[in-house]
């Protein structure tokens, strides 16, 4: 708590250690075609707070009363790319963090997320069979 480190270099091992040891991971990307950080976060039990864009919007299920009730929320998204909206998302995430039951639901849903090739592969097979008449 109350600690900050600034490193002006990239070290992949250190990056994974930091992400795995964090409760929240901020991803304020203006554009993000896909991104892997949120996927790593899910597996580490780290909750992403991200701009709702590209692959981040496709892979993070935003916290809402409905998504938390259905055990689907995996993080916090902000729609407008602005410091104010980022701050609102951070403050909301910190507020939810205080509710340990809700937080555990978000962490668990993220850790259970499946972004393997199994589902898309089955869908491709189904599609190929459909178009080939088989």
Positions of predicted regions on the chain:
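Short glycine/serine/threonine/alanine-rich loop segments
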Residues: 2, 46, 115
